[in-house]
């Protein structure tokens, strides 16, 4: 439906469709939310592991999404809870998104005190210099060059391949496996006799 109004001798045409679209809440964004002007606000929350969070503007507008890539600071970029910032934002299909975030006076942000937890297993390897299971290799060993010795018993009169303790531990494991085999064969014989 089309409405015609006369203003100062000029014809002004409006359609009912445009009047309903102006009532749409998505189109009622204030000019400060749409422009790239500098706004002040606080960090509502920020997930340091995922690298994003939300800002609450001081002027009471809609919350603004912030990604770590737009935060101005060196090193690990994050925001502390309730940290005061100044930011620029733009409207996207998902809502308001920050395009630049800095400290209140335009400098680097302070950032969060938390760091994401890294699920990294420590790799334990044997240092062939000191013989310890540690997180270093022989070229990085703090003890310096050591004399050749057995890494199993630390004896300096022989090497690991010729260690007398190696045979003792092998004979114990062999005797255990032999006794396990004999007991399992005896159990099989008893079950066969019962049937």
From Swiss-Prot:
Low complexity composition-biased segments: 170-188
Residues holding Zn(2+) 1: 127, 130, 136, 141
Segments for region (Disordered): 1-31, 164-195
Cross-referenced SMART domains: CSP (SM00357), ZnF_C2HC (SM00343)
Gene Ontology terms for molecular function: mRNA 3'-UTR binding; mRNA binding; zinc ion binding
CC per GO annotation: cytoplasm; cytoplasmic stress granule; cytosol; nucleus
Chain ranges of zinc fingers (CCHC-type): 126-143, 148-165
UniProt-listed InterPro entries: CSD, CSP_DNA-bd, Lin-28_RNA-binding, NA-bd_OB-fold, Znf_CCHC, Znf_CCHC_sf
Entry keywords, A to Z: Cytoplasm, Metal-binding, Repeat, Zinc, Zinc-finger
Pfam families, per the entry: CSD
A biological process from GO: post-transcriptional regulation of gene expression
Subcellular location, principal: cytoplasm
Record: residues binding Zn(2+) 2: 150, 153, 158, 163
Annotated family: Belongs to the lin-28 family.
Protein name (database record): Protein lin-28 homolog
């Amino acid at each position: 439906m089309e409405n015609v109004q006369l203003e100062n001798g000029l014809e002004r045409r409006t359609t009912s469709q445009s009047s309903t679209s102006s009532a749409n809440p998505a189109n009622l964004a204030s000019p400060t939310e749409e422009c790239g002007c500098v706004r002040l606000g606080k960090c509502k929350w920020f997930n340091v592991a995922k690298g994003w969070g939300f800002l609450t503007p001081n002027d009471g507008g809609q919350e603004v999404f912030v990604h770590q890539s737009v935060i101005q600071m060196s090193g690990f970029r994050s925001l502390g809870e309730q940290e005061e910032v100044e930011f620029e934002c733009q409207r996207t299909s998902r809502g308001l998104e920050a395009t630049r975030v800095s400290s209140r006076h335009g400098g680097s942000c302070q950032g969060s005190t938390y760091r994401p937890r890294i699920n990294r297993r420590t790799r334990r390897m044997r240092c062939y210099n000191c013989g310890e299971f540690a997180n270093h290799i022989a070229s990085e060993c703090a003890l310096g060059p050591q004399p050749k010795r057995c890494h199993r018993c630390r004896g300096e009169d022989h090497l690991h391949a010729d260690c007398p303790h190696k045979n003792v531990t092998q004979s114990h494991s062999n005797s255990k496996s032999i006794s396990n085999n004999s007991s399992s064969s005896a159990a099989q014989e008893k079950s066969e006799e019962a049937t």
